[in-house]
Structure formats: C-alpha cells, structure tokens
Amino acid sequence: MLWKITDNVKYEEDCEDRHDSSSNGNPRIPHLSSPGQHLYSPAPPLSHTGVAEYQPPPYFPPPYQQLAYSQSADHYSHLGEAYAAAMNPLHQPAATGSQQQAWPGRQSQEGSSLASHHSRSASLIPHISGLEGGSVSARREVYRRSDLLLPHAHALEAGLAENLGLHEMAHPIEEVQNVDDAHLLLHDQTVIRKGPISMTKNPLGLPCQKDLVGVVMNPSEVFCSVPGRLSLLSSTSKYKVTVAEVQRRLSPPECLNASLLGGVLRRAKSKNGGRSLREKLDKIGLNLPAGRRKAAHVTLLTSLVEGEAVHLARDFAYVCEAEFPSKAVADYLTRPHLGGRNEMATRKSMLLAAQQVCKEFTDLLHQDRTPNGNNRPAQVLEPNIQNCLSHFSLITHGFGSQAICAAVSAVQNYIKEALIAIDKSYMNPGDQSPADSSKTMEKMEKHRK
C-alpha cells in the first residue's frame, strides 16, 4: 500500500509539471508527431527500480523505448525516490543509459522539482511511518526484515541478543555439544560399550534401560554353555560361561579377538561368525572391535573356560594330596644327613625354616581374591600385590594360583615327613658308628624295594 501512495503522489506532481510545461509552449514529449496517439502516464523516477521477485508492468508501451529493469543495490527503492533519499541519501543508484535516452526531458526537470519533493515528503513521512507496519507485513515474502535494515543489521542483532540474553544461552549450548562430541570420541576405547542399549525386563517384570557407563548390567547372567575340552567322551560335561567371564577375556591382560574368543566359546567357524559374535556381545553391553590383536601369548590354558580350568586345578590338588609320595621322598633326601646329632640338628633347623616360608607363601595365595566365575569376593590384600596376583590368575583362567597352592602343599607334606624321619633318628642312641649307620641305611633301602 505504501508504494501505491508514493506512485499517486508522483503522478500528481508529474501532472502539475506537464501542465506548467504546456502552458509555456513547451510540450512534454516533443518528438510525438501523430495526432491520434494518446498520452500515457508519466514514467517512474529514475531511482525507482523493481525487485527480482516482483516485476511491475511497464508504464510505456511501444513506440517508446522500454525501461531495462535491474536489481538495485538500494534497499529503500520500494519507498520511492524522495523517501529513499531522505532515509539513506548515500544509496541512490546512478541512472542507466537507456533511462537517460528514454527520458531526456525528465532530467531537466529533476532539479526544479527536487525541492518540492523534499518538502512534500517531509509532510508525508509521519503518515507513511504509520502505514509502515502494514505494508511491510503485506510484503514479507518480497523483503526480509534483515534486508530492509541491512546497514544496521549487525547492531540490531547485537541489541536483540543483549536484550533477550541470547549471548548467555549460546555458551551452555556449545558446552553441551562439546560434551556430546567428547562422549562420542570414547568409541572403541574400552570393552564396555558406552551409551544405552536395548530395553530388557528386570526380575520384577518392569522395563529398565541398561545405561552402561563403566559397568555391565548383569555380570552373573549366563552368556552360553560350553562343552569341556579335557573330559572323556563318556563323561562330557558343560560349563556355563557368564557375562563377567566374557568381559574378563576381552579385557587385559589377554584382550582376545573375535577369532580366539570364538574358539574359547566353541563357536563353529562361519563366514559371518565374527560379526554375529560382535552383535551378540553388543546386546549385553560389551564392545569387541573388528581387527583387534591379542595382547597375551596364547597357551593351552587360553582355550579353557574358567569353570573347566578351576575343575582341572581341583583335580590336580586332589592328586597331589593323595598320590604324591611325600614319605618316600623325605626318607631318601634325609638319609645323607643322619651322620651325627649336630648334622641332624642343622638339617632340622633348615626344614623348619623352609616350612615357615612355604606356610607364608600359601597363606598369601589363599588370600587372593581374583574374581572367578560368579564369585566376586571383597579384596583383603593391598592393591599392588592383588593386581599382580589377579594378572596371573586371569592369564591362567583361575588355574594358576590353585595349582601352585596344591604343589606347595605337596612340598609341605614332604617337609613334614622329613622332620619325622630326623626326629626318629635323633631319638635313637647316638653311639652308632658310621658302619652301623650305613648298614641301617642299606636295610632301609632294601625294605623300600
């Protein structure tokens, strides 16, 4: 509506100018010679140009030369020449050559009518400002608010940001984005997968979300059942593998890859075996990166699950306790040290010291609290020594510490038998000669045979 008012004002001014020029004997358009040709509406001012989105119909059909409309750099051109000059006189576009040729008489009249334009525009500015809101809202599709106020756009945005507090809101948003990016960078850094996984139901039947940030939701859950490797065909037994055990196999010190873990779990080799295993582990919250390299040397114990390794250690302890020939070894090793009371006393003191050392060693191993199977006992030892014992136990899948305890127990049984033999010899009369003692030893050997 604003540009219509502007055109009406300019039309009245042009009619007055044409009337003045005709009264002085100077016609408005001198090169028209045809009497039947009618006069057309005056041309728009030189500064009035259209926009790319809306092309108004030309005011002057043939034989007049048609104006070449171009995109103006003036952002106030839709308000008209007078108002654009009053608002921003530094942004007036220069007249093109075609405009100067089409309207030669108009240029001579610009200077005379400029003063009257400014005076009338000053009186119309209050009315136009009142209509500005409606006109701009009606032409939102053609002009944006930032385009109309382009010279002051940065200052306006700064003022809005200051009044609305947008500059304070931008910093928390950026911090949240940085935290999310930093959280995404943790991918493949640990065995436990970060972030929430699929919904499951707890024992009460209520859905709960596994938000795995450093822990596995249910470590005691059975992941699969694995047949034993060392059992006979007639007594094949299966061992349950828990989620916690799988996590220990993927964590240091072993860091098994998909191929080795599939062998431990007795999974048949297939084309997509590694991918299916990774997907199954991902469902329980464990991360197994593709192309991973193992960290520890592979041994026969690597192929055993913890249940079978512990079973093997218990059987080994039973065999050591029941079948190891502790008495025969003690008698054989004690015979050379029965020459005299002093020698037997020295030997006895050495055996007592060894017995004390073995007792301290086994007591330390019995205090090992490395998690195994479903057992997660509380730590008793200091963290530095417990970490070392846990490293050995994890490498051997729980077999190592129990097997060493069984072996040291066999050594302790030998020491007990050796002390008994020395005590028997010490209680005998000490007047025996070396020859008699040698004969006694020969008799003992024959008796053993």
From Swiss-Prot:
A motif (PPxY motif) lies at residues 59-64. Induction: During retinoic acid-mediated differentiation. Sequence-specific DNA-binding transcription factor that interacts with cellular enhancer elements to regulate transcription of selected genes, and which plays a key role in early embryonic development. AP-2 factors bind to the consensus sequence 5'-GCCNNNGGC-3' and activate genes involved in a large spectrum of important biological functions. TFAP2C plays a key role in early embryonic development by regulating both inner cell mass (ICM) and trophectoderm differentiation. At the 8-cell stage, during morula development, controls expression of cell-polarity genes. Residues 439-449 have a biased composition (Basic and acidic residues). This is Transcription factor AP-2 gamma. Binds DNA as a dimer. Can form homodimers or heterodimers with other AP-2 family members. Interacts with WWOX. Interacts with UBE2I. Interacts with KCTD1; this interaction represses transcription activation. Interacts with CITED2 (via C-terminus); the interaction stimulates TFAP2B-transcriptional activity. Interacts with CITED4. Interacts with MTA1. Expressed in lung, ovary and testis. Expressed in most squamous epithelia. Also, detected in several exocrine glands including the prostate, the preputial and salivary glands, serous glands of the tongue and ocular harderian glands. The keyword Phosphoprotein applies. Residues 112-124 have a biased composition (Low complexity). The PPxY motif mediates interaction with WWOX. Pfam families: TF_AP-2. One of its GO terms (molecular function) is DNA-binding transcription repressor activity, RNA polymerase II-specific. It is found in: Nucleus. Belongs to the AP-2 family. The modification Phosphoserine is found at residues 251, 433. Residues 95-111 have a biased composition (Polar residues). Sumoylated on Lys-10; which inhibits transcriptional activity. The keyword ATP-binding does not apply. There is a cross-link at residue 10 (Glycyl lysine isopeptide (Lys-Gly) (interchain with G-Cter in SUMO)). Residues 292-423 are annotated as: H-S-H (helix-span-helix), dimerization. Residues 13-58, 94-130, 426-449 are annotated as: Disordered. One of its GO terms (cellular component) is mitochondrion. GO terms for biological process: cerebral cortex development; dichotomous subdivision of terminal units involved in mammary gland duct morphogenesis; epithelial cell differentiation; epithelial cell proliferation involved in mammary gland duct elongation; forebrain neuron fate commitment; germ-line stem cell population maintenance; hair follicle development; inner cell mass cell differentiation. Transmembrane segments: none annotated. Keywords: Activator, DNA-binding, Isopeptide bond, Nucleus, Phosphoprotein, Transcription, Transcription regulation, Ubl conjugation.
